[in-house]
């Protein structure tokens, strides 16, 4: 087998079509690779407690909304789920709870009374953080992530595209859960 060396005079310059097609092919290839690796969508929350969810985040990304007792909300962007679920996948959820409908607002005219009321309301705020497993979504479309806030500072998450309450939705927990007398430690 002989090796031939091309001489400069034997080389042909790239055509204009080739010069344009190479970057397009690279761009389309990267786009296909990225579309296979991630899916991004909203961060939602369902509150099953009598507390207000003042704010929450999933892996540092804000859920945006304040969620009242026994309500849903959110709409922050974006939870990015890998295309393929892997055993041991988790998310970290940080949230703050507080009094939903504070009683006894004294108004602003009597500043000492107002400040005492404000301090009382602030004393009920609690910061929470929990790492939870992302359920297996193999073979399913991923539509962001929904965090369910449960009594005893517990949470569940799902990536389901179905609406809460529909028969196909994976979390069947009733919206209005009774608060237990005490929570497990």
Across the structure, where does each feature detected by a protein language model lie?
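Beta-strand-rich cores of mature extracytoplasmic or soluble domains
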Residues: 97-185
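N-terminal secretory signal peptides that target proteins for export/translocation
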Residues: 1-16
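Bacterial N-terminal signal peptides
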Residues: 21-32
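Boundary at the C-terminal end of the N-terminal hydrophobic targeting segment
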Residues: 38-40
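Structural motif
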Residues: 43-51
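Beta-strand secondary-structure signal
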Residues: 44, 92-94, 146
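Tryptophan-paired
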Residues: 56-102
């Amino acid at each position: 087998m002989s090796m031939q060396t091309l001489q400069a005079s034997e080389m042909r310059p790239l055509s204009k079509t080739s010069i344009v097609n190479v970057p397009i092919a690279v761009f389309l290839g990267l786009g296909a690779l990225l579309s296979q690796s991630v899916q991004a969508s909203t961060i939602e929350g369902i509150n099953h407690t009598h507390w207000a969810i003042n704010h929450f985040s999933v892996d540092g990304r804000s859920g945006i909304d304040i969620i009242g007792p026994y309500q849903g909300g959110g709409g922050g962007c974006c939870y990015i789920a890998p295309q393929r679920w892997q055993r041991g996948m988790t998310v970290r959820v940080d949230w703050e709870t507080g009094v939903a409908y504070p009683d006894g607002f004294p108004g602003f005219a009597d500043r000492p009374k107002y400040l005492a009321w404000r301090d009382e309301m602030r004393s009920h705020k609690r910061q929470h953080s929990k790492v939870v497993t992302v359920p297996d979504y193999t073979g399913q479309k991923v539509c962001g992530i929904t965090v369910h806030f449960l009594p005893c500072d517990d949470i569940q998450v799902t990536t389901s595209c179905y609406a809460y309450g529909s028969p196909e939705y994976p979390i069947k927990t009733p919206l209005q859960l009774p608060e237990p007398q005490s929570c497990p430690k």
